[in-house]
């Protein structure tokens, strides 16, 4: 693991931008993208950068079940709002949250990942150590699957909705094995609320109780953490 400590959120985004610039310059063609509040500062920098994404493919980690891409709370909408409207990709894949045939949607997404091996996978981390929507207890061998969100994850995401009861309780997510198949992984963690998860990921045992701990086994992982997120290392 390559651990990069920075002062604050702004510096974390600047360092992440450098990693993206370097990856694309060295031929990265497929970028795995994440949602949530953590990557927004990076996306703001990517949106105004000189990087040309028009020949690249993006693959997102997850999507809420039951929301289509026009819904303002969907992750497709999130990506359009924060990045895609400024930097279009050749193809942008997000799981189909509205498909009534979940098994078909899962197989289709797994096929996309196999056909487009991810060069650089971006991750955030949940307070409970989840990556994507892979909650504690998720098998390290998992591929794309339907997830029942934990109460802590629902509560953490409630700030994006009018009220907590509006937060979907299920999602379709790339699995941990899918994430680990990426050539390079970049995890960004900022804020004191992520400090325990960061410590468990870097220094704790590798356990499905802390999904992100599996990153210790990946050959090319960079973790960018600000002072607050590093406070329990």
UniProtKB/Swiss-Prot annotation:
It catalyses: alpha-D-glucosamine 6-phosphate + H2O = beta-D-fructose 6-phosphate + NH4(+). It holds the Pfam family Glucosamine_iso. Pathway: Amino-sugar metabolism; N-acetylneuraminate degradation; D-fructose 6-phosphate from N-acetylneuraminate: step 5/5. The keyword Transmembrane helix does not apply. One of its GO terms (biological process) is glucosamine catabolic process. The keyword Hydrolase applies. GO terms for cellular component: cytoplasm. Keywords: Carbohydrate metabolism, Hydrolase. GO terms for molecular function: glucosamine-6-phosphate deaminase activity; identical protein binding. Its EC number is 3.5.99.6. It is an enzyme of class 3 (hydrolase). The active site is at 62 (proton acceptor), 128 (for ring-opening step), 130 (proton acceptor), 135 (for ring-opening step). Catalyzes the reversible isomerization-deamination of glucosamine 6-phosphate (GlcN6P) to form fructose 6-phosphate (Fru6P) and ammonium ion. Belongs to the glucosamine/galactosamine-6-phosphate isomerase family. NagB subfamily. This is Glucosamine-6-phosphate deaminase. It comes from Leuconostoc mesenteroides subsp. mesenteroides (strain ATCC 8293 / DSM 20343 / BCRC 11652 / CCM 1803 / JCM 6124 / NCDO 523 / NBRC 100496 / NCIMB 8023 / NCTC 12954 / NRRL B-1118 / 37Y).
């Amino acid at each position: 693991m390559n651990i990069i400590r920075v002062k604050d959120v702004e510096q974390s985004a600047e360092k992440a931008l450098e990693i993206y610039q370097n990856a694309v310059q060295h031929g990265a063609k497929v970028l795995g993208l994440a949602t949530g509040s953590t990557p927004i500062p990076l996306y703001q920098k990517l949106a105004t950068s000189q990087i040309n994404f028009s020949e690249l493919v993006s693959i997102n980690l997850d999507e809420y079940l039951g929301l289509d891409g026009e819904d303002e709370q969907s992750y497709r909408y999130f990506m359009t709002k924060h990045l895609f409207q400024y930097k279009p990709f050749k193809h942008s894949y997000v799981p189909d949250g509205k498909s009534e045939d979940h098994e078909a949607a899962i197989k289709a997404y797994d096929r996309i990942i196999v056909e487009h091996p991810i060069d650089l996978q971006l991750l955030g981390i949940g307070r409970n150590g989840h990556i994507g929507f892979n909650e504690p207890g998720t098998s390290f061998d998992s591929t794309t699957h339907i997830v029942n969100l934990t109460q802590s994850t629902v509560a953490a995401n409630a700030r994006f909705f009018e009220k907590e009861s509006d937060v979907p309780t299920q999602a379709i997510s790339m699995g941990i094995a899918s994430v680990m198949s990426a050539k390079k992984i970049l995890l960004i963690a900022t804020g004191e609320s992520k400090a325990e998860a960061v410590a468990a990921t870097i220094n704790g045992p590798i356990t499905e109780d802390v999904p992100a701990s599996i990153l210790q086994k990946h050959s090319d992982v960079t973790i960018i953490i600000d002072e607050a997120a590093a406070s329990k290392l």
